[in-house]
């Protein structure tokens, strides 16, 4: 059989003809340090701190008004610039004729916050046990850069006022949250809305803070937010060649092991995820596979047409399967038991691999890497040369070149047996279709989350796989 044109044209290295690099275009995510640098660039360009504060506070007021309408409001202001944003927000809400009160934790300390306090013409209460509740509470006590929990008395008053409010809004990040790690440094109430100033922060998409933010909206405050860390958005899928054939759409070759159910889920997901041809090497027939998935008793891992090799789901204690996979020059998705049998990350170098560990598998393979989850993910990818899909409630996708994708909040019902097998299959399909490794992993992560939303809370992994075509349709509709 003659090799496809795309193979011959790429110097004997198989890449489907639809292959093209896809830029990461999701919303940028800035750490506290990078946010300060972005603000400083704006200031160096002629903006003032007061102008940035005015834009942040005005945006906070606008978002709160759109969310809650003309609701009597209580703005809680801290001593720093986050408190200054609160003074500005209160002024803009009052200008709409909304009854507004301010309760301050302390007098402003920064010059910009003092300016914002001076622009407020109303009274300022002291935040205390006697502070009366309000239907709308806006939290501007502390923002990014917080490194310690709130004092107990402050935490108690924040909780009391939020518990009695109808609507709770946070400015930038909820007070008590460490913005870079998503860790709750002290008790954090559940907010209905969080208004991120200038850029998303890691905490907006990291466990456990993400679950306290409610809906997160992004406010433009006039800064240029550039980052290699971005929110994963709907994938830009490569167009199909009208004159192409199944190999142009990508061949996924999966290696079965002891537990056929897992590889069956992964292979089904790869087929439903758009791969043109899915093949499973198995020593015995696997029941329940779609008829379109080819079962073979030979492991043709060096077939030059393979767009992606999938190994790990259901592999069990058969390390020889992984050893065989690592002899192939094809791009790989390495999941589940295969991750455990890697033993050391050095085996990934030169493999063009995507690995998909959950927390336990990550620690067993990479050890105790220092830093927050994003830093650990990036370091693991750099050290191994593989794209790392660090799974969890806050799944991250890390590239060896330092790029990091944060999955948007996904349904909690994804925490179910077999959903990781489906994810591995979808990523393999995306890789076989020609997306580069990082983009393929991000695409698979987004599609899995969207499929879970479509499948609903009663889903099992089989339903998740069945929903992949609808998730693909949603991604395509967003491209138009």
Question: For the regions a protein language model found, what residue spans apply to each?
Answer:
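Short amphipathic alpha-helices and their capping/turn segments at secondary-structure boundaries
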Residues: 123-132, 338-348
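Internal gly/pro-rich beta-alpha loop/helix module
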Residues: 136, 141-229
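A short, gly/pro- and small-residue-rich
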Residues: 152-168, 319-336
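Nucleotide and nucleotide-moiety/phosphate-recognizing core
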Residues: 61-141, 149-171
């Amino acid at each position: 059989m003659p090799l496809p044109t795309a193979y011959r044209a790429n110097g004997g290295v198989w890449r489907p003809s639809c292959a093209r690099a896809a830029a990461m275009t999701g919303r940028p995510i800035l750490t506290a340090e990078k946010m300060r640098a972005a603000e400083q660039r704006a200031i160096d360009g002629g903006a003032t701190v007061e102008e940035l504060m005015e834009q942040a506070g005005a945006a906070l007021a606008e978002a709160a008004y759109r969310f809650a309408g003309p609701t009597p409001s209580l703005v809680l202001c801290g001593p720093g610039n986050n408190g200054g944003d609160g003074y500005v927000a209160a002024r803009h809400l009052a200008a709409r004729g909304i009854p507004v009160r301010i309760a301050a934790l302390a007098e402003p300390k920064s010059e910009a916050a003092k300016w914002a306090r001076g622009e407020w013409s109303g009274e300022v209460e002291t935040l205390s046990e006697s502070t009366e509740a309000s239907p709308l509470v806006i939290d501007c006590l502390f923002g990014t850069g917080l490194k310690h929990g709130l004092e107990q008395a402050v935490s108690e008053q924040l909780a009391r006022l939020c518990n009695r409010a109808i609507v709770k809004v946070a400015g930038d990040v909820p007070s008590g949250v460490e913005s870079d790690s998503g860790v709750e440094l002290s008790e954090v109430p559940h907010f209905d809305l969080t208004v991120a100033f200038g850029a998303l922060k890691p905490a907006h998409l990291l466990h456990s803070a993400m679950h306290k933010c409610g809906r997160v909206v992004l406010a433009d405050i006039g800064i240029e937010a550039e980052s290699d860390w971005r929110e994963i958005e709907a994938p830009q899928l490569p167009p199909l060649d009208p004159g192409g054939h199944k190999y142009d759409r990508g061949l996924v070759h999966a290696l079965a092991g002891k537990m056929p159910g897992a590889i069956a889920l992964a292979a089904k997901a790869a087929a439903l995820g758009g791969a043109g041809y899915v093949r499973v090497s198995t020593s015995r027939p696997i029941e329940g596979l779609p008829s379109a998935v080819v079962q073979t008793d030979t492991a043709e891992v060096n077939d030059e047409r393979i767009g992606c090799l999938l190994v790990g789901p259901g592999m069990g204690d058969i390390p020889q399967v992984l050893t065989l996979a690592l002899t192939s020059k094809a791009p790989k998705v390495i999941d589940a038991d295969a991750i455990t049998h890697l033993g050391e990350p050095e085996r990934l170098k030169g493999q063009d691999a995507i690995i998909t560990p959950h927390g336990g598998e990550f620690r067993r393979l990479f050890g105790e890497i220092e830093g927050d989850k994003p830093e650990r993910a990036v370091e693991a990818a750099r050290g191994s040369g593989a794209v790392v899909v660090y799974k969890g409630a806050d799944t991250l996708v890390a590239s060896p070149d330092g790029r990091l994708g944060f999955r948007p909040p996904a349904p909690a019902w994804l925490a179910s047996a077999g959903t990781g097998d489906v994810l591995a299959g979808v990523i393999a399909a995306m890789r076989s279709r020609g997306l580069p490794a990082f983009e393929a992993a991000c695409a698979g992560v987004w599609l899995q989350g969207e499929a879970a939303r479509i499948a609903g809370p009663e889903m099992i992994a089989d339903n998740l796989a069945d929903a992949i075509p609808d998730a693909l349709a949603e991604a395509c509709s967003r491209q138009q």
